[in-house]
Swiss-Prot record:
EC number(s) recorded for this UniProt protein: 1.1.1.261
Organism whose genome encodes this protein: Thermococcus kodakarensis (strain ATCC BAA-918 / JCM 12380 / KOD1) (Pyrococcus kodakaraensis (strain KOD1))
Keyword NAD part of the UniProt annotation: yes
Cofactor, free-text remark: Binds 1 zinc ion per subunit.
Protein name: Glycerol-1-phosphate dehydrogenase [NAD(P)+]
Length: 351
C-alpha cells in the first residue's frame, strides 16, 4: 500500500506589533537559533529598519550583513549562499520587501539555514510563504523553498512604506478568490490534490480584506494590521497545501506574463488585482465586487491607471497559459484567443 505523506512546514512564531526591532533577539533565542547571524537588506530597507535590526542583534550574536542591490535574481541568491558558507552563518534575517525576503528564502533553503522574515512592506503574500519568486534568464519563476521560522511584522515600520504598497497587498490577497476557483477546477478536471482546509483559510483572508476595505483605505496602523494578517494567513494556507495553489492561479500567470512583456512592470499585487477582475469574469463570478474592493482601497482597476498599453494586457492574457503549462486554470490548455482576451478585458473595464 502506498504511503501518503504530506509535509506542512509553518512559521513557528508570528509577531505583529509596534517597535519590534528590539524583539528579534528574544524571538531568535526562543526558537533556539545559534551561531552567527546574517542580516540581509536593500539599500533603502537598511535605512528604514535594517541597521536597527543589526544593532539589536549585536547585543547577543555575532553579526554579518549583506546589501541586495539587484533584486530577487539568481546572482544575488548565489552571492548570499556564498556568504553563508564562507562565514559559517547560523541563521539569516531578511529586512525588506518581497525581493529581499525571496533571496533569503531560497538561500536559506539551499544551505539548510533557518531564516526570519522582517517585512518592511505589506505588498505581497511572500512574507510568510515557502515560495520564492526569482528572476532568472529574463523571466520570473516561482521556486519552492522553505517558509520563515518566524515572521516579525512591525506595523510602524511597514506604515512608513508608500500607501501604494498596502493597496498592492490587497490586490495580492483578493487574487485568492480566483486562485481557489482554479484549484477546484484542476481538482475536478485533472484530479489534482485539493485541500479544503488550505482553500478555506485562503478565501477567509480574501474576504477579510474585502470586508475591511474602508478601514484599509485610511492607511493607518490598523490598516497595516488587517493586510498583514491576511497576507500571513495566505502564506500559511500555501504551506498547508504544500504548493502556491491556494493563492496563485490564472491571475498570477497573467501577472508573470506582464513581467515578461514590460520593461518596468507595476507592483506584483497591482497586476494580480487586475488579473483577478478578468479571471473572476471568466469564472462567472461576481467580478464587479472584486473591482469595487480594489477601487475602495485605491488600487488600480484598469490598464490606464497602471500606465500599461491595452495591447500589452491583451497579449499577456493570450500567453498567460504558457507560463506554467502544468498548472491547470480557467485559461485551459490552449489559452484565450485574442478576441476572447479583448472581450474579457473590455467588459470588465480593464481596457
Amino acid at each position: 500500500m502506498e504511503r501518503r505523506i504530506h509535509l506542512m512546514q509553518l512559521p513557528r512564531e508570528v509577531l505583529l506589533g509596534e517597535n519590534l526591532t528590539g524583539e528579534v533577539v528574544s524571538v531568535a533565542k526562543r526558537i533556539g537559533l545559534t551561531g552567527k547571524a546574517l542580516v540581509i537588506y536593500g539599500p533603502k530597507t537598511k535605512e528604514i529598519a535594517g541597521r536597527d535590526v543589526e544593532d539589536a542583534i549585536k547585543s547577543a550574536y555575532e553579526v554579518s550583513s549583506l546589501t541586495i542591490r539587484k533584486g530577487a535574481t539568481m546572482e544575488e541568491v548565489e552571492r548570499t549562499i556564498e556568504k553563508i558558507k564562507d562565514e559559517g552563518i547560523g541563521w539569516v534575517i531578511a529586512v525588506g520587501g518581497g525581493s529581499i525576503i525571496d533571496v533569503a528564502k531560497l538561500s536559506s533553503f539551499k544551505t539548510g539555514v533557518p531564516f526570519i522574515s522582517f517585512p518592511t512592506t505589506a505588498s505581497h503574500d511572500g512574507i510568510a510563504s515557502a515560495n520564492a519568486s526569482i528572476k532568472d534568464l529574463g523571466s520570473k519563476t516561482s521556486v519552492k523553498a522553505v517558509p520563515p521560522v518566524a515572521v516579525i511584522a512591525d506595523v510602524k515600520v511597514i506604515k512608513t512604506a508608500p500607501y501604494r504598497y498596502l493597496a498592492a497587498g490587497v490586490g495580492d490577497t483578493i487574487s485568492n478568490l480566483t486562485a481557489v476557483r482554479d484549484w477546484q477546477l484542476a481538482h475536478r478536471i485533472k484530479g489534482e490534490y485539493y485541500s479544503e482546509y488550505a482553500a478555506s483559510l485562503s478565501l477567509m483572508s480574501a474576504k477579510m480584506v474585502m470586508r475591511n476595505a474602508d478601514i484599509i483605505r485610511l492607511g493607518n496602523e490598523e490598516s497595516v494590521r488587517k493586510v498583514i494578517k491576511a497576507l500571513i494567513s495566505t502564506g500559511v494556507a500555501m504551506s498547508i497545501a504544500g504548493s502556491s495553489r491556494p493563492a496563485s492561479g490564472a491571475e498570477h500567470l497573467f501577472s508573470h506574463a506582464l513581467d515578461m512583456l514590460l520593461d518596468k512592470p507595476a507592483l506584483h499585487g497591482e497586476q494580480t488585482g487586475l488579473g483577478t477582475i478578468i479571471m473572476a469574469y471568466l469564472h462567472g463570478m461576481k467580478w464587479e465586487r472584486v473591482r469595487e474592493t480594489l477601487k475602495r482601497v485605491g488600487a488600480p482597476t484598469n490598464a490606464y491607471e497602471l500606465g500599461i498599453d491595452p495591447e500589452v494586457i491583451i497579449e499577456a492574457l493570450t500567453i498567460a497559459h504558457t507560463i506554467r503549462p502544468e498548472r491547470y486554470t480557467i485559461l485551459g490548455k490552449d489559452g484565450l484567443t485574442r478576441e476572447a482576451a479583448e472581450k474579457a478585458a473590455k467588459i470588465t473595464g480593464v481596457i
